[in-house]
Amino acid sequence: MEKLTDLNYTLSVITLMNNTLHTILEDPGMAYFPYIASVLTGLFALNKASIPTMKIALKTSKCSYKVVKYCIVTIFNTLLKLAGYKEQITTKDEIEKQMDRVVKEMRRQLEMIDKLTTREIEQVELLKRIYDKLTVQTTGEIDMTKEINQKNVRTLEEWESGKNPYEPREVTAAM
């Protein structure tokens, strides 16, 4: 354990890797060498940092699978960020949390739609009742004789002499 966390040991291994790469790739026109060296250095540093961390986490935690999974996901996300990707790896727990949040939001929206639909139905029923009260309904023929005091009106055939007494007559006056 001491050997894994020893800084001098880590630096000597990095120097050894760089020297090995320099001897393998002796071409001075090699343009990608610094990038390859930095990636390998980063991978080595991640290896040296993650192994002791995982050993300690496995010894101290009760649920080792979740810790290992979280460490691996964190390492891969770090590598993706170093490579310039914006995407991240998510675990099933995070996906389930997001799905629960989406389902909860959908339920809330469905409840809101249900409330609004109920209110709209109540408003339509109220408008229908108001419309029914405002519309003119035909009740058939209305007896208007009581309204104009003509209950005893007779027709021409009903008069005794056969003439209407209210019909105007010609009147001649003497001068």
From Swiss-Prot:
Q: What does the record list as GO biological process? A: monoatomic ion transmembrane transport; symbiont-mediated activation of host autophagy; viral process
Source domain of life: Viruses
Extract the Pfam families matched here. Answer: Rota_NSP4
| Residues that carry a glycan | 8, 18
UniProt membrane topology term: Single-pass type III membrane protein
**Segment ICP binding domain: which positions?**
159-175
Name where it's found.
Host rough endoplasmic reticulum membrane; Host membrane, Host caveola; Secreted
Give the protein's recorded name: Non-structural glycoprotein 4
| Species whose genome carries this gene | Rotavirus A (strain RVA/SA11-Both/G3P5B[2])
